[in-house]
Each structure stands twice: as structure tokens, then as C-alpha cells.
Amino acid sequence: MAKRSLSALNSDALRGKRVLVRVDFNVPLNDAGAITDDTRIRAALPTIKDLTGKGAKVILSAHFGRPKGQVNEDMRLTPVAARLSELLGAPVAKTDSCIGSDAEAKVAAMADGDVVLLENVRFFAEEEKNESGFAEKLAALAEVYVNDAFGAAHRAHASTEGVTKYLSPSVAGYLMEKELQYLQGAVDDPKRPLAAIVGGSKVSSKIGVLEALIDKCDKVLIGGGMIFTFYKARGLSVGKSLVEEDKLELAKELEAKAKAKGVQLLLPTDVVLADNFAPDANSQVASIDAIPEGWMGLDIGPDSIKVFQDALGDCKTVIWNGPMGVFEFDKFAAGTNAIATTLAELSAKGCCTIIGGGDSVAAVEKAGLAAQMSHISTGGGASLELLEGKVLPGVAALDEAA
């Protein structure tokens, strides 16, 4: 169901209004407490600037880290407020707490177009419990609600779901709208052929998404450590490679399901092996039916890359979630880099390429190809759940589009 978006609210509906905006500012910090990647802060700028430009009083709500419901001085949003202020070229006040007298006073002092960042909502255990009294206090600071935190949309928390019971309108921000447009669109109404590339080390973490994608895709390409569970299920020797013994039957079922549905399910034909799990390990390429004892697979091989590239060549929509190998080790990054390059080339030819959160995003950024993809999702778990066809509580709680 389409959700009402910020784009539907004009200046008259927003000028002078206090607008609570849930953002995803869960950014990485180094040991010195400096932000090492401000992508998530930048991703919220279109929504924030639109609101300030329309004369709204913008009250930002965010979580940072896992403080477990208590104040943790290392998880305050102070560096985030400073960076946001630099990006906006305007002051950003930060409250000492997300509710209470300091937050109320700073909000009361706001002029039209001002921005205030509320302190980490997860300093209160009530946030993750979606406790109604806490949600009501948070909502009492504002008159309008905008959710732009797609990365937290799969959680029914007070700041993502609870506050919508007390604020109307409750709408999607521009980042949320874009995420839903691409990810929901890829699942519900894609240009075909539709392919999914699923990687990562474990089948167990991708069961739901694999089952859903086999239902919806024309082709499913599997890479990463999970391939060895499929090979072992076929009766092949996998050496020291990672295998989930309790998922062998499931691997067989997934292959059978794809076959029954006429979906092309492709596994690598060769792998790059290592004698131990290290960046400087000895390596060799072997066919999947000739993996020697004592060796482990850490990447897809050169023949597999060609097979995957050929399979993707005619696709009009491609979703990628999870790397092809241990791309953190340069020696075992060729498969992941080749897929990133292939998708960049497909994008240039008009294919819709969607990077579905998590490690694939890091891989595309490491390859310097992020700008060439159609859409890079900011959500890890949220992206997976949406691709699985699950309802995201933070999305469901928003107003329906007129």
C-alpha cells in the first residue's frame, strides 16, 4: 500500500509547525570519537533541508549504538550534531535527553527553520519496548511526524511506530520514500528479467530472503560461504569450507523449489581456495567437484564470474545482497569486485541495480562504484525483511497516500 510522503505536504502545512523527524544517524566512530563515515547523515539532508526551507521547526530523533536503556557517555549524539551542523551550514542544538525539561525548553525556543537533535532515544529502555507513555512524551514535542529512518523501519519502537498514534499527519521522508519505491518496486512490479544475487557466509541468515526471491525472480545467483552448504547437500567434498550441517536438507529443498518453478538457480562452478583463513594465505583455484582436503573456499572463481556475468547480461532489474567471498582480504575480493563492476556496467545500459544493504554496500563503496548503482539501500535488516515480503512496522504505521 502506498504511503503518504513529505512531498504531499506544502509550505502552508509545515510553516511554523514542530516536526518530529526520525532519522538513522547510527554512524561509525573511531577510537577518538570521530565519525568515520557520514553517509547516513548526508542521506537525511534532503528531508531536513526541505522542512527547514518550508519554515518548519525540525526536531530530529535518532538512536546510536546499543546503550541498553541507560545513559552511556560514549553513545551521546554530540559528534553527530557537530557534523550535521557543518553539512547544513547552520547551528544544530542538541538536547541532554530526548524527553524532559531540557528537550521541552530547547524546542520551545526554536524559531521557524531551526534544527534540534534530541539525545539518543535508546538511553531509555521504553524506546525498544515501544512503551506508550514514553512515545506520548516524545510525540508531545511535535505536531507532525516524518519517518526517514528506513534502517530502523523493521523495528516497532516508540520513535518509529509508537509516536504515530499521537501525531497526524505521519508521513515518509524522502529517503524512506526512495527506499520503498526501489525495494518494494523490485519485489512487486519489476522490469524483467529480474535477478537476485545473494551472498554472505550463512544460509541460515538468508533463508527467508532466498525463499521469497525464488518465488519472485527469474534468476537467483548464489555466492559467498553459503555455497558450500549447497555443495555438501549435493554430495560434494568441500574440504575445510564453512558448512551448516543442519541446513543441508533446506539447501536441497531450495534447489528443488527453484527447479519446480522454472527459476534459474546458479551456483559457482569454481572457487578460490585458501589453506587458512588469512589475508596472506596460500591460494589456488579449483572446480567445485575437486576441492582438496584441508583447503577452504574464500571466493568464487574466474569461470564462475564469467557464468554469472553471462546470466546477468539480459537482466532489467538486479538485486544484490551479500558479497561473493571474503572481500575484506584483497586476495579473495575478485569475485565481489567483478559483480560490482558488472552491475555498474548494467546500470549504464538502463538496468535497475539495487544494492540491498549490509556488506554489499561496503563492497560497492570499496570498489568506488557506489555512484553508478541505481539505488543503494541504507537498511540492512530492513532491506532483507522488505525483500522477504514482510510488513515493516515503521512503514505500516504511516498514513496511507490519498
Swiss-Prot record:
Q: Which GO terms describe its cellular component?
A: cytosol
Q: In which pathway does it act?
A: Carbohydrate degradation; glycolysis; pyruvate from D-glyceraldehyde 3-phosphate: step 2/5
Superkingdom of origin: Bacteria
Q: Where in the cell is it found?
A: Cytoplasm
Pfam families per record: PGK (PF00162)
Q: What class of enzyme is it?
A: transferase
Cite the HAMAP family for this sequence.
Answer: Phosphoglyc_kinase (MF_00145)
Which named protein is this?
Answer: Phosphoglycerate kinase
